[in-house]
């Protein structure tokens, strides 16, 4: 009795919709010290699991059977999958094998800080990091250093260990995060409709998150300058605010490192710079970085030689000391970067809601943002187009829409011309599409977004001439109007990315508003032509007895 049938035990879990709700926590000084100890234990445990898993991965890849499995052609997927699965099972490289490893490593003092379920979640996190290396999506893993620390811990369920408990209205309607012997009260604003909607849904599990504050004197921060929040994974769909409407059109997007083209089938087209409101103060950040370097050198002179060069570190080398001034400067720099990231996230949310308000079906090309990071590192690091697509994917899924990312190799939207059907590669410097068949000139990004808007995701994704003949008659005027609006913004002085195909507004202005410099005067002296060093002056009219004025030369004036 009590044994479930094999079919029922191996049935996969049903995936239900999940959304997050974040609540700040009120943490006392003693509780904060215990939380730091728990997170430090989690850091060391995660590093131990990661180190053991990395050893298993090296042994598995050194086995000759690994090379034999790689030699199996991809046209035989079942044989290839079976060979790799046998290797993973032999060397214990799977998520459940890592859970068994976590059971072995969770001994001594670690068991006082981490229960079995939390240890399994950390083991799963380590396995996913190593599995990215195994499948070729990453090159190395990062161990959690003492300086970085572990910023979050989560549970698998909400009935034991780290859990969130909500009191009934008769008991005060308060929320508590319970972990070991600590009960951390959560700040709940019941007047907020988002919070009220979220707490009406069942809690799947809770996640404790530690975030740095601007200083120890910041509101809600402990003496180490850190805040604690709880993230609740709730079953259901998030609240849709009335101000965030959902349209019914189909929208085509063309995303670039610094710009985005939005072309719906019915509404007006747009060509916008991505996160144009972001204004990072690079000069202030560089000054903070130089100050941190000076403070680091002053506190650690033994780590530098007589010429100021860092010494090579070996085993047993002394640790780097961090002065209080260095930590304060680091917090100031982190606060600047945190505010910039929050502003970027807010701008992403505004743009996503504007797009979703036009249409619930969005079509764009599937891009490789890692390649953009290599070529346009500064622009991608500032505007984060990959985070924009991830934000859009979550928002569209929560509103019941569809985000379709079409492959670039089959569609070739930036090279295709719907007038003649020719596919002509263009260099990146060519920002206009103009074909001898009569299509164009039209801005390249707008034209690619137009082609994406009229793709049929349910059918063949290869664009054809027939499907664009009728839409082009009404879309050409909308694309030209969108580009004219961009030109007006450039004339007003806004600096726009060069990828929009418009010269920078500063290039149209003269370098100086003063009068043009006059040409040098040349004099003939002793048979040689010499430049006159004095600045030429206008002729002076001297009245004479006669009615005709007499011009005086500059030499005569002096």
Give the location of each predicted region:
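Generic detection of short hydrophobic beta-strand segments and adjacent strand-loop junctions
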Residues: 19-25, 184-196, 272-276
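Positively charged, helix-rich recognition surfaces that bind polyanionic ligands
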Residues: 226-558
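Stable alpha-helical structural segments in soluble proteins, enriched in small hydrophobic residues
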Residues: 49, 121-129, 133, 446-456
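Acidic carboxylate diad motif detector
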Residues: 71-221, 382
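Nucleic-acid-interacting cores, centered on viral/eukaryotic replication and modification enzymes
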Residues: 16-20, 27-29, 109-113, 126, ...
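Short coil/turn segments at secondary-structure boundaries
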Residues: 51, 62, 137-146, 302-308, ...
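Catalytic micro-motifs at enzyme active sites that drive phosphoryl/nucleotidyl and oxygen chemistry
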Residues: 9-13, 212-220, 235-242
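Gly/serine-rich nucleotide phosphate-binding loop at the start of the catalytic core
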Residues: 2-118, 557
